């Protein structure tokens, strides 16, 4: 098991961030709890990756963002991954996710950071404001995975978090230290 990865769960107020975490981790979902405002909470989860390894995730359930309120900058400095949440029945929440992705790219400078996007509340399809195809095209252009989920069906939540844990547990692709027995191109040699 790894050291534990810090994952920030963020999105507009009332998109279902806390409900997603409560359902995923504890199987709890109470209809009508959507209006409870979260200040900030941290959940611990041990998630099995696609390679069968358990990864410890520290899931930071952030306060719901509102008009004119940005995600506090300290989240960008320590996060290993992000779960961006919008509600399919709220176009503004999707637009905020687009802005959050741009902010992450700016602060993380496209470094190793895992991002998954969740379009929540697909059970409210008759109130849909975010077209599924438009959202998927955006996700593809941003090179992130997007799932449409509902907290009323816990199974829809498992795959995104399994993929996230798998991405976070992958060994770093390049080391900044030379491997023993290999010559570095940049090293000057005095053996001439």
From Swiss-Prot:
> Where is the short sequence motif Effector region located?
35-43
Q: Which domain of life is it from?
A: Eukaryota
| Major subcellular location class | cytoplasm
Segment Interactions with NFKBIA and NFKBIB: which positions?
58-93
Per the record, the coiled-coil ranges are none
The record's section on Gene3D superfamilies has: P-loop containing nucleotide triphosphate hydrolases
Return one Gene Ontology term, BP aspect. Answer: negative regulation of canonical NF-kappaB signal transduction
Q: Which UniProt keywords apply?
A: Cytoplasm, GTP-binding, Nucleotide-binding
Query: Under the cellular component aspect of Gene Ontology, which terms does the record hold?
Result: cytoplasm
Q: Does this UniProt record's set of keywords contain Cytoplasm? A: yes
Q: Which residues bind GTP?
A: 11-18, 61-65, 120-123
Domain-related comment: In contrast to other members of the Ras family, the members of the KappaB-Ras subfamily do not contain the conserved Gly and Gln residues in positions 13 and 65, which are replaced by Leu residues, and are therefore similar to the constitutively active forms of oncogenic forms of Ras. This suggests that members of this family are clearly different from other small GTPases proteins.
Its name, as the record gives it, is NF-kappa-B inhibitor-interacting Ras-like protein 1
Q: Gene of origin?
A: NKIRAS1
């Amino acid at each position: 098991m790894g050291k534990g990865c810090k994952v920030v769960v963020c999105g507009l107020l009332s998109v279902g961030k806390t409900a997603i975490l409560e359902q995923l981790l504890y199987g709890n979902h109470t209809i009508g709890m959507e209006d409870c405002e979260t200040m900030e909470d941290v959940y611990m989860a041990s998630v099995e990756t696609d390679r069968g390894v358990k990864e410890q995730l520290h899931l930071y359930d952030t306060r719901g963002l509102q008009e004119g309120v940005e995600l506090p900058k300290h989240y960008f400095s320590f996060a290993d991954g992000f779960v961006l949440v919008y509600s399919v029945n709220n176009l503004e929440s999707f637009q905020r996710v687009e802005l959050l992705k741009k902010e992450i790219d700016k602060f993380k400078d496209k470094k190793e950071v895992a991002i998954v996007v969740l379009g929540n509340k697909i059970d409210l399809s008759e109130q849909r404001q975010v077209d599924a195809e438009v959202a998927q095209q955006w996700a593809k252009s941003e090179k992130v995975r997007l799932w449409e989920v509902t907290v009323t069906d816990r199974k829809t939540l498992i795959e995104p978090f399994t993929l996230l844990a798998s991405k976070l547990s992958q060994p770093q692709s390049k080391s900044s230290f030379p491997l023993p027995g290999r010559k570095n191109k940049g090293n000057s040699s005095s053996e001439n």
